[in-house]
């Protein structure tokens, strides 16, 4: 499903971010990606989301060749992805319900499908009682649950979680990973980037270790930790797997009609999409176009640093 073949990335300023990376991730896998700051994790994610293109090598995701992809195809490719950010990226003047519904509205879902799907997903993440609350009325853990619900709501084939536990307490961190694992049990591919090594040791999953832009370890967890001889500097060691405090919410299919997906000629209006794309105080919807005139909201965000 996801193939990196001899992928290297060198930025315009000469920074070498990735060097000859070869990774294959099958459909339905749950993979942790770990590494110190500057190891190449952010570049790895940007390449998967087609925010960047490789300097050399090929990246294939679901038969899309990302390096050769035309810009107009990017929005349709990104509909296969559900993104969970460390900093939540919630829209402050929208309720929990509307933040989650917004992700469906952007891709053209029908309102009757939204009314069925959104409450179901909000219930999965345990926030039904907070559906009408605003982000500033939620704890950090609750905000991250909203971000997770937003990533789930469009039934993405691939969930990419970028440090999803970075701003929450240990108990909530465990619950977030459990939610991702329950989702993974339904066949969704999950890739979680994290520096929370203690958390990784609790699960028997594949771990990819990046260091200096290279893959230095890639394998299944052994006895609760990846092979120590391959990543001893990360202090990943065997630890008894805990099963306490596991949430039991099952990801079962809710009775609903299949949402109608818009054809390419029905892509959302570019001006509207640019108005909601932001790197700072609102979350980025991974839909864009190559022809657009900035709206007032987009102009207000002008000058923000790229992620």
Please give the residue ranges for each predicted region.
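Helix-to-loop junction immediately C-terminal to a conserved catalytic motif
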Residues: 49
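Conserved ABC transporter NBD signature motif
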Residues: 57-65
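A short, proline-enriched helix->beta-strand linker immediately N-terminal to the Walker B motif
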Residues: 153-157
């Amino acid at each position: 499903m996801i193939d990196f073949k001899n992928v290297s990335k060198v930025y315009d300023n000469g920074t070498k971010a990735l060097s000859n990376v070869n990774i294959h991730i099958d459909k339905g896998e749950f993979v942790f990606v770990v590494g110190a700051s500057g190891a190449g994790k952010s570049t790895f994610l940007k390449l998967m989301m087609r925010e960047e293109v490789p300097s050399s090598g090929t990246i294939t995701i679901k038969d899309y060749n990302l390096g050769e992809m035309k810009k107009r195809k990017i929005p349709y490719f990104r509909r296969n992805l559900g993104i969970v950010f460390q900093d939540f990226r919630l829209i402050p003047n929208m309720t929990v319900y509307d933040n989650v519904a917004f992700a469906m509205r952007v891709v053209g879902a029908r309102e009757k499908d939204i009314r069925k799907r959104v409450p179901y997903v909000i219930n999965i993440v345990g926030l039904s009682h907070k559906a009408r609350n605003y982000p500033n009325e939620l704890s950090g853990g609750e905000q991250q649950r909203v971000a997770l619900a937003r990533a789930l709501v469009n039934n993405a084939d691939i969930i990419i979680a970028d440090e999803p536990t970075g701003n929450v307490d240990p108990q909530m961190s465990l619950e977030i990973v459990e939610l991702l694992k329950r989702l993974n049990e339904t066949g969704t591919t999950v890739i979680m980037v994290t520096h929370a090594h203690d958390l990784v040791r609790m699960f028997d999953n594949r771990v990819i270790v990046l260091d200096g832009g290279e893959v230095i370890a890639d394998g299944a967890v052994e006895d609760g930790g990846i092979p120590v001889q391959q990543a001893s500097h990360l202090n990943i060691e065997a630890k008894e797997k805990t099963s306490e405090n596991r949430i039991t919410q099952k990801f079962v299919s809710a009775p609903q009609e299949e949402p109608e997906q818009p054809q390419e000629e029905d892509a959302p209006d570019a001006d509207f999409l640019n108005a909601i794309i932001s790197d700072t105080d609102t979350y980025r919807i991974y839909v864009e176009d190559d022809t657009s005139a900035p709206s007032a909201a987009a102009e207000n965000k002008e000058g923000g640093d790229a992620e």
